[in-house]
């Protein structure tokens, strides 16, 4: 409300591993904080995370990159020309996610560090 975005922002909750319904096309921005922990790393997580966070919110597949591949491939067409796909990434995953975006035709790929200096956000633009 403070920024008068209510009429201009739509939040949706969908299965990101499936292609979007045609009603969900024409986004300017898709922001995604997918599960990114490699399956084999989950048993070693701190108990406060491992035992209390839903497993589906943590498990990013064998290498932690399953959701990045799926969302990049299946949701690219839902972005407008000039639209941006923004991902939160796990520690050390930024180069792999940059590569996934590049291989899927995204341009202007940028990576941003968090307040601890860890590369945490990767984004790319669709310029078909």
Whereabouts are the PLM-identified features?
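S-adenosylmethionine
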Residues: 1-127
């Amino acid at each position: 409300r403070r920024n008068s975005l209510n009429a201009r922002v739509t939040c949706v909750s969908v299965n990101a591993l499936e292609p979007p319904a045609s009603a969900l096309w024409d986004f300017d921005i898709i922001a995604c904080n997918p599960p990114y922990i490699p399956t084999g790393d989950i048993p070693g997580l701190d108990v406060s995370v491992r035992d209390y966070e839903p497993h589906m919110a943590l498990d990013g597949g064998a290498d932690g990159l399953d959701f990045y591949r799926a969302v990049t491939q299946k949701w690219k067409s839902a972005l407008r020309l000039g639209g941006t796909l923004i991902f939160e990434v796990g520690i050390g995953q930024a180069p792999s996610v940059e590569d996934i975006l590049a291989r899927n035709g995204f341009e202007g790929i940028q990576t941003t560090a968090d307040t601890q200096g860890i590369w945490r956000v990767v984004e790319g633009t669709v310029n078909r």
